[in-house]
């Protein structure tokens, strides 16, 4: 009889990294479908560009480091990084922007630290922030949802705008961004912040076409609900834990409610915060990154709550309309400290 001697751990989780990443990619399908429906084919083009760029960038670095290219690419982490960045940027952003952001995310924010499992910051959000700071105009040029859009670009038009800046008929981004009221549209969060600073009342702002949705912003409410559906499926599959999404959303809702009660003329209502921007995408797909989030249950609650507070502060008082990316990166910085003070006590040892 032959006995096999193996080192610990002796109990293994059968779900490999590649399977977890694949589950997250599958869970993103409802959110992607919603963005395609409300914002057009540009989202699909950006996803394809980001995916190819992520795989090529990762393969190049692995080749230079003389590591197995095929084995590493099979973990699907590069694909997920590209996907998260692609759905975070405007659908008709120039092609070179998503390529630049993805390459930066994979090479600088991930591989430079040693690859998957070593990076302290979420790579997709690093790429997003680099693009936002470097090209703020292009990164905030979102199309109006098709419900209130005048010009809805088709698949060919989307490709032409992304690669040349113009449609076949000569239309550009300024034309495509016009809403049914003839005014260039922005996201619900951007519209609210800009209008408040211009001295408009909340009652006036809520009459804008972008807020014609049942719950929050037109189109955006359904996009967020679609990402929420994908997130709930991830929880059901036990691919992520509930601590971070719950604490993030509860904290954001509480802060928004308190702010709205104390200053209803300058601060957005809770439903605007919860169902606009990247709220649900951030709660279930970005903050839950196991590499850059806290590793203890108490730590996850603190981590999520901190991110929720930061999102509300940035949206309400900062210079950017949506603070999810900045909140994620700032929360990432605190992870070592959070884990240090929330680590479980070793059995048989006194606390401290």
UniProtKB/Swiss-Prot annotation:
- For this chain's UniProt record, which GO biological process terms are given? electron transport chain; transmembrane transport
Q: How does it sit in the membrane?
A: Multi-pass membrane protein
Q: Which GO terms describe its cellular component?
A: oxidoreductase complex; plasma membrane; plasma membrane protein complex
Q: Where in the cell is it found?
A: Cell inner membrane
TM ranges are 20-40, 42-62, 78-109, 123-143, 148-168, 214-234, 242-262, 267-287, 301-321, 322-342
Q: Which GO terms describe its molecular function?
A: oxidoreductase activity, acting on NAD(P)H
EC id: 7.-.-.-
Predominant localisation class:
membrane
- Which key words tag this protein in UniProt? Cell inner membrane, Cell membrane, Electron transport, Flavoprotein, FMN, Membrane, Phosphoprotein, Translocase, Transmembrane, Transmembrane helix, Transport
| Known cofactor(s) | FMN
At what positions is FMN phosphoryl threonine found? Answer: 187
Q: Which NCBIfam families match?
A: PRK00816.1, rnfD
Entry function: Part of a membrane-bound complex that couples electron transfer with translocation of ions across the membrane. Required to maintain the reduced state of SoxR. Probably transfers electron from NAD(P)H to SoxR.
Give the UniProt family note: Belongs to the NqrB/RnfD family.
Complexes and interactors: The complex is composed of six subunits: RsxA, RsxB, RsxC, RsxD, RsxE and RsxG.
The protein here is known as: Ion-translocating oxidoreductase complex subunit D
The species is Escherichia coli (strain K12)
């Amino acid at each position: 009889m032959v006995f096999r001697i193996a080192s610990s751990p002796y109990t293994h989780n059968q779900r490999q990294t590649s399977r977890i990443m694949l589950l997250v990619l599958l869970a993103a399908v409802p959110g992607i479908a919603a963005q395609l429906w409300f914002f057009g084919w540009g989202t699909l083009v950006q996803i394809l560009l980001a995916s190819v760029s992520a795989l090529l960038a990762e393969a190049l670095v692995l080749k230079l480091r003389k590591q197995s290219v095929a084995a590493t690419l099979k973990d699907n982490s590069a694909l997920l990084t590209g996907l998260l960045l692609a759905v975070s940027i405007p659908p008709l952003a120039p092609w070179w922007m998503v390529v630049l952001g993805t390459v930066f995310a994979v090479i600088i924010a991930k591989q430079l630290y040693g690859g998957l499992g070593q990076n302290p910051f979420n790579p997709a959000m690093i790429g997003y922030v680099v693009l936002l700071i470097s090209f703020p105009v292009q990164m905030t040029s979102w199309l109006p949802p098709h419900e209130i859009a005048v010009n809805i670009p088709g698949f060919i038009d989307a490709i032409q705008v992304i690669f040349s800046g113009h449609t076949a008929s000569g239309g550009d981004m300024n034309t495509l961004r016009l809403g049914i009221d003839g005014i260039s549209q922005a996201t619900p969060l951007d519209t609210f912040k800009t209008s408040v600073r211009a001295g408009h009342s909340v009652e006036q702002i809520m009459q804008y076409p972008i807020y014609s949705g049942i719950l929050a912003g037109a189109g955006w409410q359904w996009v967020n609900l679609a990402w929420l559906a994908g997130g709930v499926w991830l929880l059901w599959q036990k691919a992520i834990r509930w601590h971070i999404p719950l604490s993030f959303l509860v904290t954001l809702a509480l802060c928004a409610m308190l702010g709205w009660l104390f200053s209803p003329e300058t601060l957005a209502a809770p439903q605007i915060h919860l169902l606009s921007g990247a709220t649900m995408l951030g709660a279930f797909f970005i903050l839950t990154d196991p590499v850059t989030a806290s590793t203890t249950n108490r730590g996850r609650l603190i981590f999520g709550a901190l991110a929720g507070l930061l999102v509300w502060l940035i949206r309400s008082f900062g210079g950017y309309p949506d603070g999810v990316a900045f909140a994620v990166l700032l929360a990432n910085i605190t992870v070592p400290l959070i884990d240090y003070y929330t680590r479980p006590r070793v059995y048989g040892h006194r606390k401290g």
